[in-house]
């Protein structure tokens, strides 16, 4: 992809681990991938999604290893319904510790473009951001 095509992309990273967020955001900027806006939790992500238009997002949906834990996919649903400033069809990748058949089915229904299983290297996130197509960031 030509450098000028991806240089101005605004992307969202929702991840509770501060070191991982900072590493990915700074590396993406230095590689010319665009600007990574960071959110440590869903509330911060919603605030950013209301205020900014994004070309793509990588969202951690960790459930942990708790028994009978269900993944919270409400943020994905709201993005896909067009309730935020971004185009409802933006590419979304999710990070999770486990990927059951049920979760993968739920993510497929929400048009999630990539599932990243933890643990992983920061490079995997950078590759996910680099793969996002530069869609129009605003709703039609």
Name every feature range the model reports, one short phrase each.
Residues 70, 74, 94-114:
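Alpha4 helix (beta4-alpha4-beta5 surface) of REC/receiver domains from two-component response regulators
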Residues 56-86:
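Conserved phosphotransfer microenvironments
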Residues 8-19, 24-28, 57:
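Conserved acidic segment of CheY-like receiver
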Residues 29, 80, 105-109:
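Alpha4-beta5-alpha5 "output face"
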Residues 120-129:
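C-terminal output helix
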Residues 2-5, 135-140:
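CheY-like receiver
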């Amino acid at each position: 992809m030509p450098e000028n095509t991806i240089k101005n992309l605004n992307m969202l990273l929702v991840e509770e681990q501060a070191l991982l967020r900072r590493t990915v955001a700074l590396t993406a900027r230095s590689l010319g991938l665009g600007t990574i806006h960071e959110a440590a939790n869903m509330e911060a992500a919603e605030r950013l999604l209301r205020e900014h238009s994004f070309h793509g997002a990588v969202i951690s949906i960790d459930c942990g290893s708790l028994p009978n834990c269900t993944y919270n996919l409400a943020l994905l649903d709201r993005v896909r319904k067009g309730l935020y400033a971004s185009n409802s069809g933006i590419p979304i990748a999710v990070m999770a510790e486990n990927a059951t058949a049920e979760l993968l089915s739920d993510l497929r229904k929400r048009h999630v473009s990539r599932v990243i299983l933890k643990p992983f290297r920061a490079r995997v996130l950078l590759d996910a951001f680099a793969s996002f197509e530069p869609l129009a960031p605003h709703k039609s």
